[in-house]
Amino acid sequence: MDSLKNMIFDLSESNGTSGAEGEISDIIENYVSAFAEVKKDKFGNVTAYMPAGEKTILLDAHMDRIGMIVTHIEDGGFLRVAKCGGMDARVLAAQDVTVWGRKPVYGVVTSTPPHLSTPEDAKKAKDFDSILIDTGLSKEEAEKLISWGDRITVKCPHGELENGRIFGAALDDRAGCAVIIRAARLVAESKDRPSVKLLFSGQEETGGDGAVTGSYNLVADECLSVDVSFADAPDMPSEKCGKLNKGPMIGIAPVLDYRISQKLKETAEAKKIPYQLEIMGDSTGTNADDIAISKGGIRTGLVSVPQRNMHTGVEIISLEDVENSAKLIAEYILGGGLDA
């Protein structure tokens, strides 16, 4: 699975915070254009079409990543920031970051030494109003390279753990992007299947707008949305988490089409693909919520890759879970989808 691993690392290390997905969209286009016709819509979503049968199945994954946005340049070259997506302020102290200015500028989130912290400081994380980034530049130097509105991402080298697990930044949802690219490759040579459309959507982390606009334009009979979800770890509620190396999580929720969820389960069992269930009592917090009500409604299912350390600079997934997620989706498509 080295080629899959390398693709995930390639995707995860690229820029592409919400609303500034240009770099990641180019990388995705490069991968997908090898087997499908690729376009970019007005919103910046990357779409692709693989024609075959009358029925059309849409595969969706969001390509944006969480980060920060520059709001002010202070004296001494320090940057004030706001979060861009669900960045967790608790894990930012002393992190090294990249500011995507006129050229990449490296910086470090400031941190108060414990010797100078008050007891109250130790009890809480800084909020974004008090977070500063040290660039090492003077204000005048910083203003030549950095503008208000430039995006910032946490730097994280990718790597491997034991038992086929990998870590890196932005695996939410670059892992999902890898899943649908891999699934599309697995079915590309078959013509005895439904037509397939791919949607690599922007701005999921700031509200899901890319899925709204993208699914409206891409007419489809049904959709499988792919994202990450919680994987178990110490002190995590086990009933709300999947497990690493135990297969994709098949979503069951009111907004999801129950027949698709059942067909995914049946497909996994028939093809001996390990899977887990993810039960949600209302919405899913993913693009599936928006796609399901697009236009007159699209029957939508959800497949998730279990992930630890979500919304941090170092997220952990199982490479095996990514491969099995792609296999499940490919077998679902080759089986004709719903009501085949």
Residue ranges, per PLM feature:
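N-terminal hydrophobic/helix-forming segments and targeting peptides
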Residues: 1-340
